[in-house]
């Protein structure tokens, strides 16, 4: 089977307000080597966003009322957007979910457990009283994107687009709305557009944290990893802090440098003080540990995340995956059932379906089929609302749907962007359609950066065996199972069978 990767929640990013976040003194920079430390760009450029207005008169509100509204808005918008691949994909390139996706967003340092529905209601009330507040419209657009993520409802994207356009009509080119456009583009998997919007902000505000982070995300999702690494260095020099540190870590993980990734995340967690920051960074550490097969550490980190915010979905899903890999399948099923009840996204739906299949009890096959059907329904809804869902289609359909559709989608996604994830998806779609010779180069490309991913190694091993490369195939399958022996309820079992048959 083609197991989905544990979602990498990359895009826990800065506030929609665009204000500077001062890192904790204990957080430091991203743990860079000394030669990089010597090249710090500590000078903070002038902030040019509308948040710099201090007289409160620009939109007709008195200073006290303006400040109160901003504080209330920040509290309500206390969840971060992910990039589209991150938020909705069956696997992430930038992965930490991704997403995301994937994209400019709200501050993880705000109070945990904030409700996007409440934020939308409050903003709508505010905008009825202040219809010319371009900041308010931009924030509403970002909140609709966040609402789509947390609800698994792409139908919010047209509403987000309308709100952002309203903001830009009132104040052409304002940073917050352009950052919102980057978030929306990433959520719809338009990473070229997201990069363009981020660059637009950075041209006149090079210290805009949301745009710096969006730029890294977009470059990662486009497979431009060397540029993403340079963008991470630039962001770390200009705006060191948790949103940048997590991206810096992921860029290193993609290169196979897990040690640096872990060190940077641990430093970020040491400096985290708010519930949102703690939940976010601990989840990143949990996902990194899970990917390396260290389930005990993964569960410890997910527990730490949930102690900070017991509603944080990526931690709940990650804990369920680690439980499944540790043999706690009843707890894993219960946990994933709760996750999909709140956000029925492809990653969690496929994971739950495969757990049902692996359990093999009465009615479990039908339960699994329902999860896979829901994936297809979500993909149809996503496409109807402007989301490029080809990667989701390729990954889900290759094992649990129309194999021909999986290959068509994988080819289409590969034509748009060459990443380790799109290479893996194309390789596996080619394999299940009987095109193993063509699949081989893509399977090897998926592992060429050094990224340590058991699913990729499993796919590579199966393709190598199918093309007569028995020694290499056995080595790849062995590496997959040594790295993460519980990487998938179905895939891990099939890897063991294939390895045994190849002896």
Which residue stretches match the model-derived regions?
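N-terminal leader/linker segments that initiate helical-solenoid repeat arrays
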Residues: 3-5, 13, 26-170, 175-176, ...
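Short coil turns that delineate tetratricopeptide repeat
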Residues: 131, 172, 206, 239-240, ...
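TPR alpha-solenoid repeat register
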Residues: 136, 177, 211, 244-245, ...
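Canonical tetratricopeptide repeat
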Residues: 139, 180-181, 214, 247-248, ...
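Residue-level recognition of tetratricopeptide repeat
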Residues: 142, 146-149, 183, 217, ...
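Residue-level detector of the short coil/turn that links helix A to helix B
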Residues: 155, 189, 223, 256, ...
